[in-house]
Amino acid sequence: MSPPATEIKAVYEEQGYLSGVSILSTQELQDARDSFAALEREFGEEYTAYSLHNVHLKYDWVMMLAKHPRLLEVVTAVLGQDVLLLDSRFICKYPVLNHGSARNQGDKDTIPYTNGSGEREEKDLETNQKTDPGLPFVAWHQDMRYWGLDGGPVLSVWLALDDSKEDNGALQVIPGSHCSGMLPHHPSKRTGNMLSVNQEIPEELVQTENAVLCPLQAGQMSVHDGLLVHASDPNTSGRRRCGFVIRYVPTAAYPIQDPDRPRSFPATVLVSGEDKYHHFKNIKS
């Protein structure tokens, strides 16, 4: 049973995020994983790592995830009853078990650690990989840096298709950092940053000593505010880390012309309540 809406909203407004919220049943999770596996076979992992953008308009099963009642229960507790789905994307960090771009093609559900020397060797490899500048990671950033919006907050969901742990690059957040407003973002000096604009918040502005890891079991979700400072490390495990990222806004939000944040919104969907404002074109329902 979910906490009362008032409790959800209070924690979210104070901390800027919620984590470990159970959404999918065992069967729903298996169905979603099977459907995603079909896309991997069709398009290949290089494509499915980051290029499945706004496919909620193409695949019914993806739209069902974005409109899942338990998910929307949390979203509406934070944003109110009138909510738009703004944008969606699958993001996958595939396992990299050697330096370079080679990927493990084995069973993605298998935990590679074993007792004895196997565990020690794997952890040594993990240490080396975290210092490899080429491995995919997500730098410290705020989502709102890339969204030309005003009139309401952006809420981001990570719905986990795989377990998300420290060793495969789980989300890290700075609690309460959403209260500091927009921070400067500069071009990243490190290679491997998955952010398409390759920016990051300068390290001296990030209170990394306050960072909190947000591990998830497959079928759970985390949600965070568009101004929350967050990041994720490379996947140094032998397991995939895949999730469905969904952005929601209250219907009162509206796009703005900002040359630093150019953005179009061609895939908006009314997922709860009614839209009294009609700020976005081509809204689906």
Regions found by a protein language model. Name each.
Residues 42, 183, 221-223, 227-285:
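Non-heme Fe(II)/2-oxoglutarate
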Residues 58, 86, 153, 167-169, ...:
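Residues that flank catalytic or metal-binding motifs in active/ligand-binding sites
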Residues 10, 117-121, 164-229, 233, ...:
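Double-stranded beta-helix
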Residues 1-140, 145-148, 185-186, 259-261, ...:
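Non-heme Fe(II)-dependent double-stranded beta-helix
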Residues 136, 149-153, 236-240:
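A generic structural micro-feature
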Residues 141, 148-166, 215-218, 223, ...:
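Short, conserved beta-strand element in jelly-roll/cupin
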Residues 39-42, 81, 164, 180, ...:
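Phosphate/oxyanion-binding loops and surfaces in catalytic or ligand/nucleic-acid-binding neighborhoods
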Residues 81, 133, 144, 149, ...:
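Active-site region of the double-stranded beta-helix
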